[in-house]
Amino acid sequence: MDQTHSDRARPKRRRRVAEPRIPESDVLPETMLALSRAGALVQRNNSGLLIGADGRRVRVGMKGAADILACYPVGLGVRVGLYLAVECKSSRGRLSKVQKNYRTAALKAGALHFVVKSEDDIAAMIDELERARRWLRGSNDMPDCLAALIQP
């Protein structure tokens, strides 16, 4: 006996469990606070278009630049720090083309670049910076953020 199309058992679809969306406006201050607590000098990097008091449009900042710029101290007996560019995104956010270009330019210039979307990403970034500090002080455990800079 042949089954008709409607009689066949259809495979059940798995429902995606929706993760709670974390907005960039929550990620950014948490990232700044974590970097500051870790000893970094932190600056919120604003960019965009402003309307002046006289009505003129004024473009500020570099297009695609990271949300946070920071200097993370390494302390090698002299005042030495790592320059960081941190892009904060919502939990589902992605880098735009101009942000990818900025990331490439920052890495080429010797900066460390991180994309942060959650508390886990913030913790991983701080851990990576601590590994960089230890490596620069003589540890054999080179962190990924520095390995990316050293590759030809």
Please name every model-derived segment.
Residues 1-152:
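Catalytic phosphate/metal-binding cores of nucleic-acid and nucleotide-processing enzymes, i.e., regions
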